[in-house]
A protein has these predicted regions:
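Phosphate-coordinating loops and pocket residues in cytosolic domains that bind phosphorylated ligands
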Residues: 38, 111, 140
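Helix-turn-helix-type domain boundary/helix-start signal
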Residues: 3, 31-34, 52, 99, ...
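N-terminal DNA-binding recognition helix of tyrosine site-specific recombinases/integrases
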Residues: 8, 16-23, 29, 39, ...
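Contiguous, well-ordered alpha-helical segments that form the cores/surfaces of helical PPI scaffolds
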Residues: 46, 68, 125-129
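Conserved tyrosine-mediated DNA breakage-rejoining catalytic core shared by Y-recombinases
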Residues: 87, 131, 140-167
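Basic, Lys/Arg- and aromatic-enriched nucleic-acid-binding interface segment
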Residues: 56, 60, 75, 79-135, ...
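N-terminal helical hairpins
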Residues: 1-5, 9
Length: 167
């Protein structure tokens, strides 16, 4: 069964592929279905955390994608190695503190002098701040979804519709 992947999912898979290729080049460890085991897991973890200086959440995202590919490959009979199913082959993550801009910081951004090309980007950024939307949802704002007293938008990340009141 074929499913359509979102742009961000494709991007994450491509980033994982590129990271694996860089890992091979940097360490000499050849990545294949047969070589993905707990030794790979530990070396890849050290590479992500120490060599690339990325977070544990980035490592967790890469492992989640690798496990997803291995599950599919096992399901269709291409992969026979089941090391990735062991307890130690975990998708790690840690809670992050949400970061946000204060009202004063948003106001400062609004009054900062910028050249014309950055000025438009800033205006879009501020609009999205005031609407409480992600920057990726900007293309979804059209005349068709702006009503008398609200804006209805199908959000890209969650694929759910939100209705934003206009005051």
């Amino acid at each position: 069964q074929r499913c359509e992947l979102k742009y961000t999912t494709k991007r994450d898979y491509l980033q994982t592929y590129n990271t694996l290729k860089e890992f091979e080049t940097s360490t000499g460890y050849i990545v294949s279905f047969e070589s993905i085991n707990l030794d790979f897991y530990n070396r890849f973890k050290q590479y992500i955390l120490n060599t690339l200086n990325h977070s544990i959440n980035t490592f967790g995202k890469r492992i989640k994608i690798i496990k997803s590919i291995l599950n599919y490959a096992t399901e269709i009979g291409v992969n026979k190695n089941k090391e990735f199913l062991k307890k130690g082959f975990k998708v790690l993550s840690e809670k992050k503190k949400n970061q946000y801009l204060t009202s004063d910081e948003i106001e400062d951004i609004g009054v900062t002098e910028l050249n014309d090309s950055l000025d438009k980007s800033r205006d879009i950024f501020l609009l999205m701040c005031y609407l409480g939307l992600r920057f990726s949802d900007y293309p979804k704002i059209t005349k068709n979804n702006i009503n008398k007293n609200h804006i209805d938008i199908l959000m890209q990340k969650t694929n759910s519709t939100v209705s934003i009141p206009i005051h």
